[in-house]
Amino acid sequence: FTDAEEDARRRDFTMNGLFEDPFSLPPGRVVDYVGGVEDIRARVLRCIGEPDRRFEEDSLRLMRAVRFAVTREVQVEKETCSSIFRNAPLLARISPERIREELDRILLSPGRKRGVEMLVETGLMKHVIPEIYDMIGCTQPPQWHPEGDVYTHTLMMLDALGRDGSPVSLELALGVLLHDIGKPPCRQVDETGRIRFSGHDKEGSSMARV
């Protein structure tokens, strides 16, 4: 058995390490051993104790950090963020099913664009959908895509989802994330310099099914 403080210090992030005193009068007194109240007020996501140890204990916390950042609209504290970069390879320990659950929650959030950016920038996406990295720098015909490469276009599309107030299903969000995933392997430039992506729709469909 452990006491409440020891239990709190084993949790992942400070905002998840709070307790309610069931005997307090008036009821509702918050017991905070880890500075969670202050971090919630400051809108900061911070690991409890040593971040590296927390992510070593349960590497799915790496994905949970991104999910909380986008669903709670908080900033990841510097040491926690650095630890995510260092420990991204640990995500390979986690089953695809558990990773998929966290990805789904990110994509269903209005902050899905930021979530995908964070997964890419931290290196976590290498263990989720590594083909996303091939979109970066994959240029497109500027007359049709002045926004830039395939990755930039995909982020813009993710950001546009739900802007008109319409509901965003998981199928729609995944479809937008993967709709151009077949472009990088199909990219060709002809003798006139024209960029083509012949067959990218079929290639992308095959890749998405995998």
Which residues does each PLM region occupy?
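Catalytic cores of the polymerase beta-like nucleotidyltransferase superfamily
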Residues: 1-210
